[in-house]
């Protein structure tokens, strides 16, 4: 992590986010993917799943070749492959992995994620909310990072909501707010009705239902923006689309503002300090227009409405897979830069 050397990254869990983080990493000049661990898929199947993606299309940027049971190459660059169930057994140190992306959805607290450090990793980024690891949202609170070894990149929905909420709160003040995310189907849902003892509705067929669901994304904004702690909460509707979700944020403002003034504030932020994180559009867009959009949150100026100058509904789109995966990599790069500057 010194000078212009590439940041060496390993991935634990080669599911939706793991595979897309790999794609993002392979597209960047400052990242080197060195190892992948997944105990549930063979290297042959791993190669196939990486190459072919029903949502984001076929990978054509580099050749992906299986050389042996424990060895893949991406465009000539070797990547070690493991199938360890215990993260402490993955030899990250052998491959110089400075950072590990923990994307299994299983090892989401600090104690469990710390197992990667035993294998030689220096830092761990959890690609999910965590009950005890510090959470960072790029564009919002990454400047609070202080060389912690284990961090969380929060959730895709928090990454959409927090930049929007920060702009509105900084400019006008938020007294209170309710968020709804209309969220695309994810891997935890069932294709047809099936058992889901903790969430009965969540066990119903994803392909044929709009499913109300709980989400901690709005409350989590209070962890990355303490000034909004206790002021936001929300829920989700899971809908039968494969990717791209949309946040509907309804807030009471502290300072009166016209909808045009709100639009201007968001547009300025999208072109300034939050460029690449927060987007702005006045086009007549729909969800598929944002597939493989790398931004965290794209404000839809035409979709929002104001009841009064202190009560407004704001709408922002996000590719819950690709945008989030980009932020995982951005957080790694930010952490590496902070490490070299200390």
Swiss-Prot record:
EC code: 1.2.1.12
Cellular-component GO terms for this entry: cytosol
InterPro entries: GlycerAld/Erythrose_P_DH, GlycerAld_3-P_DH_AS, GlycerAld_3-P_DH_cat, GlycerAld_3-P_DH_NAD(P)-bd, Glyceraldehyde-3-P_DH_1, NAD(P)-bd_dom_sf
Subunit details: Homotetramer.
Highest taxon of source: Eukaryota
Gene: GAPC
Protein name: Glyceraldehyde-3-phosphate dehydrogenase, cytosolic
One of the GO biological process terms: glucose metabolic process
Reactions listed under catalytic activity: D-glyceraldehyde 3-phosphate + phosphate + NAD(+) = (2R)-3-phospho-glyceroyl phosphate + NADH + H(+)
GO molecular function: glyceraldehyde-3-phosphate dehydrogenase (NAD+) (phosphorylating) activity; NAD binding; NADP binding
Keyword Secreted: no
Enzyme class (EC, first level): oxidoreductase
NCBIfam families the record matches: GAPDH-I (TIGR01534)
Binding-site residues, NAD(+): 16-17, 38, 85, 320
Compartments, as annotated in UniProt: Cytoplasm
């Amino acid at each position: 992590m010194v000078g212009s050397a590439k940041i060496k990254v390993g991935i634990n869990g080669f599911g939706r986010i793991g595979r897309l983080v790999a794609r993002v990493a392979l597209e960047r000049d400052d990242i080197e993917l060195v190892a992948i661990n997944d105990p549930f898929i063979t290297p042959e199947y791993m190669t196939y799943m990486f190459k072919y993606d029903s949502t984001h299309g076929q990978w054509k940027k580099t050749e992906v070749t299986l050389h042996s049971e424990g060895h893949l190459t991406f465009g000539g660059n070797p990547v070690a492959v493991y199938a360890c169930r215990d993260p402490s057994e993955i030899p990250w140190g052998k491959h110089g992995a400075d950072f590990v992306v923990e994307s299994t959805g299983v090892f989401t607290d600090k104690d469990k994620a710390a197992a990667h450090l035993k294998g030689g990793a220096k830092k761990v980024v959890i690609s999910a909310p965590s009950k005890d690891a510090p959470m960072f949202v790029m564009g919002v609170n990454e400047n609070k990072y202080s060389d912690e070894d284990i961090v969380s990149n929060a959730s895709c929905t928090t990454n959409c909501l927090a930049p929007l909420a920060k702009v509105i709160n900084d400019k006008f003040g938020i007294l209170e707010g309710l968020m709804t995310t209309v969220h695309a189907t994810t891997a935890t849902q069932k294709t047809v009705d099936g058992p889901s003892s903790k969430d009965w509705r969540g066990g119903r067929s994803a392909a044929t239902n709009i499913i109300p669901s709980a989400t901690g994304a709005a409350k989590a904004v209070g962890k990355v923006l303490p000034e909004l702690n206790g002021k936001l909460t929300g829920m989700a509707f899971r809908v039968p689309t494969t990717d791209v979700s949309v946040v509907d944020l309804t807030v009471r403002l502290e300072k009166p503002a016209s909808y045009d003034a709100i639009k201007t504030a968001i547009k300025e932020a999208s072109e300034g300090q939050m460029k690449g994180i927060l987007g702005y559009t006045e086009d007549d867009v729909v969800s598929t227009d944002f597939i493989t959009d790398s931004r965290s949150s794209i404000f839809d100026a035409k979709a929002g409405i104001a009841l009064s100058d202190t009560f407004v509904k704001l709408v922002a789109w996000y590719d819950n897979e690709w945008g989030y995966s980009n932020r995982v990599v951005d957080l790694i790069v930010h952490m590496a830069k902070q490490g070299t500057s200390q």
